[in-house]
């Protein structure tokens, strides 16, 4: 068996490719079922965010297993394997383990050390458990990843002051506004007419950062006004007006700055919607949705400036240099955590031998116990029989405890294999 991960991220694929492979939560059960339906895939888990899609699997054969995942991705996205392959990465065994731990720690994120990715890894594990696509190996690996993500943030300063996708989007707006005024710095949003489209987790974070950056008011646009109102109630110090998505054109006409973050699978803003508005002032669209909420042709409309998640690099670069030293400290911690999992994984090769050894001892115990009990005759009470049986089990468990513990103990793989072969020869075992 082999652990493998196949995926793409902001490092390997532009947003127009990433959005083709994005898997919404409502499609996760079927996607996991499809993967597990392949004979090569024993366990599977999917991480789908705005900046990455990664499929972690336990497979029978590395090449055939990766081939099965590639076929799934091609079918899901409608892209030929040749179109996808330049954007995909795949890692096996220790490299796959190292990669997942780096992801959970925020070391592979666009925004170094961002905290949201850990919640997304937890969600990946929860969905895998709910849809029964996880087995003991990936369940243990994901648990180790979550533990590692927490440990990195508690034992280093990596999470302190880290920007998020949402905060980077707000800073990008400030930066672009400043540049339009001839200032290469972040400017206040106090005088801007701002709209936020969507009322999910990312929109909540947008409202937090808009409030912190001086926004005086925000129009919150959502399909369901009640959902928007519940979110707005959490920001009593920010003036938030909630409106239905059917009023979107009104706010595209009057706003100077519009953030979009919805779960829509197709763009909700494009050139055909913007052109008839006849705007007289600049409109900046900042889209952090994946799939994108704003079509690429929106930027062709006069007076419209459009940005997506890939444009956040400009802001992120301003914040990263000071965090690199902390990241190096976190990398050392990750090495220890990865080794813990790999030691556990290596110890699993002892399980078949241990199970057969226990089975062999149990057979001997029951046979000898029956011989002894038959010699005791009918005067031997049921209670006395139970005492003798418990005694026989206790003796076997005591005898096996030390050798079983040593076979499972962390040690060089060659030493463990040598010990296993010795036990198999001594007790005439055949764990295969």
Swiss-Prot record:
Residue numbers binding NADP(+): 198-203
Gene3D superfamilies (UniProt xref): Glutamyl-tRNA reductase, N-terminal domain (3.30.460.30), NAD(P)-binding Rossmann-like Domain (3.40.50.720)
TM stretches of this protein: none
PROSITE patterns: GLUTR (PS00747)
Cysteine disulfide links: none
A Pfam family: GlutR_N
Site feature Important for activity, where: 99
An individual GO BP term: protoporphyrinogen IX biosynthetic process
InterPro entries: 4pyrrol_synth_GluRdtase, 4pyrrol_synth_GluRdtase_dimer, 4pyrrol_synth_GluRdtase_N, GluRdtase_CS, GluRdtase_dimer_dom_sf, GluRdtase_N_sf, NAD(P)-bd_dom_sf, Shikm_DH/Glu-tRNA_Rdtase
EC number: 1.2.1.70
Domain notes per entry: Possesses an unusual extended V-shaped dimeric structure with each monomer consisting of three distinct domains arranged along a curved 'spinal' alpha-helix. The N-terminal catalytic domain specifically recognizes the glutamate moiety of the substrate. The second domain is the NADPH-binding domain, and the third C-terminal domain is responsible for dimerization.
Additional notes on this entry: During catalysis, the active site Cys acts as a nucleophile attacking the alpha-carbonyl group of tRNA-bound glutamate with the formation of a thioester intermediate between enzyme and glutamate, and the concomitant release of tRNA(Glu). The thioester intermediate is finally reduced by direct hydride transfer from NADPH, to form the product GSA.
Designated name of the protein: Glutamyl-tRNA reductase
């Amino acid at each position: 068996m082999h652990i493998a991960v196949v995926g793409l991220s902001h490092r390997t694929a532009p947003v127009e490719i990433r959005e083709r492979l994005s898997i919404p939560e409502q499609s996760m059960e079927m996607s996991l079922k499809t993967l597990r339906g392949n004979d090569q895939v024993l366990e599977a888990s999917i991480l789908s965010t705005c900046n990455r899609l990664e499929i972690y699997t336990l497979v029978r054969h590395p090449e055939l297993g990766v081939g099965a995942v590639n076929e799934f991705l091609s079918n899901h996205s409608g892209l030929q394997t040749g179109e996808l392959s330049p954007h995909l990465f795949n890692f096996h065994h220790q490299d796959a383990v190292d990669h997942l731990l780096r992801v959970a720690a925020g070391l592979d994120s666009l925004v170094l050390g961002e905290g949201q990715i850990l919640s997304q890894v937890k969600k990946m594990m929860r969905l895998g458990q709910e849809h029964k696509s996880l087995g003991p190996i990936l369940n243990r690996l994901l648990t180790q990843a979550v533990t590692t993500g927490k440990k990195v943030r508690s034992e280093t300063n990596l999470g302190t002051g880290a920007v998020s996708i949402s905060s980077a989007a707000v800073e990008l707006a400030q930066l672009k506004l400043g540049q339009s005024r001839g200032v290469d710095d972040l400017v206040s949003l106090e005088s801007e007419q701002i709209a936020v489209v969507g009322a999910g987790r990312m929109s909540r974070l947008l409202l937090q950062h808009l409030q912190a950056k001086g926004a005086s008011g925000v129009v919150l646009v959502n399909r369901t006004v009640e959902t928007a109102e519940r979110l707005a109630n959490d920001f009593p110090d920010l003036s938030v007006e909630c409106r239905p998505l059917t009023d979107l054109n009104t706010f595209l006409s009057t706003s100077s700055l519009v953030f979009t973050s919805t779960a829509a699978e197709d763009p909700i803003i494009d050139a055909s919607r913007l052109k008839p508005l006849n705007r007289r002032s600049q409109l900046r669209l900042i889209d952090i949705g994946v799939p994108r909420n704003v079509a690429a042709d929106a930027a062709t409309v006069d007076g419209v400036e459009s940005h997506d998640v890939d444009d956040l690099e400009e802001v992120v670069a301003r914040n990263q240099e000071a965090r690199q030293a902390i990241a190096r400290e976190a990398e050392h911690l990750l090495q220890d955590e990865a080794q813990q999992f790999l030691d556990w994984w290596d110890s699993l090769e002892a399980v078949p031998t241990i199970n057969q050894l226990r089975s062999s001892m149990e057979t001997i115990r029951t046979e000898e116990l029956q011989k002894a009990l038959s010699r005791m005759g009918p005067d031997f009470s049921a209670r006395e029989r139970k005492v003798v049986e418990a005694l026989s089990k206790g003796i076997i468990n005591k005898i096996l405890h030390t050798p079983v513990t040593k076979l499972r103990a962390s040690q060089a793989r060659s030493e463990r294999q040598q010990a296993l072969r010795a036990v198999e020869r001594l007790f005439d075992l055949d764990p295969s």
